[in-house]
Amino acid sequence: IIIQYEGHKH
């Protein structure tokens, strides 16, 4: 499962 959330952007 891949969880992409707004906040992983450096």
Swiss-Prot record:
Tissue expression remark: Expressed in hemocytes.
- Its domain of life? Eukaryota
Q: Does the keyword Secreted apply?
A: yes
Q: What keywords are annotated for this sequence in UniProt? A: Antimicrobial, Immunity, Innate immunity, Secreted
The biological process GO terms on file are:
defense response to fungus; innate immune response
User: Where found?
Assistant: Secreted
What's an example GO cellular component term for this entry? extracellular space
State its role. Answer: Exhibits antifungal activity against Candida sp. but does not possess antibacterial activity. Has no hemolytic activity but may have been derived from hemocyanin.
Identify this protein by name.
Answer: Rondonin
